[in-house]
Amino acid sequence: MLEITLEEICRYPVKSMLGESLAETLLGEQGIPGDRSWATRDEKRGGIRGAKKIPRLMLFSARTSHGGVAEIQAPDGSLCLSTDTDINAWLSEKLEHPVSLWPLLPADNLDHYRRGAPDSADFEEELRTLFGRLPEEPLPDLSAFSEVLEFESPPGTYFDAFPLMLATRQSLNTLSARAPTSRFDPRRFRANFIFNVVGSDAAYPEQDWIGRELHVGDAVLNIVDTCPRCSMTTHATADLPRDTEVMRHLVKEADGNLGVYAKVVKQGEVRAGQTVTIV
C-alpha cells in the first residue's frame, strides 16, 4: 500500500540562499508566504541574479523575521536585515561582488525581471554554463518554461518557474546509492516540500505524479512538470563542498532532473507529518 508523508517544509526568504524549516504553513496562490520574497540584483552586469551567476550566495542563509523582513547571515556569521540602510554595501562586501537587495516588484515591471546581459554571445554555451552541462551532455527540455529564456523569474515572483518545488527522500537516496562519492543532500536542491514514500519501488517516485493532484492538509497541488537541474546543485553550500560530479550523476542517472514543480489549486494549511494522497 502506497503511503506518502510530508516530511519537511522549507522556506527560502532570499533567492539562492539557504532557508528555514517550518512546522506548518498556510499555502496561498504563490506557495509559501515569504518564500523567495527577496532577490539580489547584479550591479555589475545588470538584472536579478541568483547563484547560477553568483555562486557565493549559496553560502548565505536567511530566515523571516517580523513583518516579512529577512534576516541574512553571511558565511562569517555576521547578520544584517533586509531593511538595514547598509544592506547593499554589506552584501556586496561579503559576496565580493556589487549587488543590491530587492523585494518583489509588481509583475508589470518587466524590466526588473528581465535577464541581464549573458556572459557568452553563444546561446548554447550560455545555457550549458547555466545548467552545468558538458558539450556531450543533452540540454534540458525548456519548452514548458518559455518565460525563463527572457526573464530571470516569472514577472511578479522570484521563483525559477513555479511557486513550489517538491522532492522525495527516495530520489535523494537513489542518487546517493548510485553515486556514493557525491553527497545528495536536500540543501543542494532547495525543495519546498520533501516527502517520504513507503510502498513504492520507483527510483524517483515524484516523477510519476506529473499531471496529477496532490492533497496535503487542506491544500491541493497540481504537479506541473519535472524540475531540470542547473549548476547551482554543484556549488558549495553550508558544509557541502563544490562538486561538479553531482551534475554528471544527475544527467547519467536521472536525465538531469530531480523533483517536480507544482501550482496551488486549493489554498489551505499544511503541516509536516501529514499523510498525502495522490489523485
Regions found by a protein language model. Name each.
Residues M1-V279:
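Metal-cofactor-dependent catalytic cores
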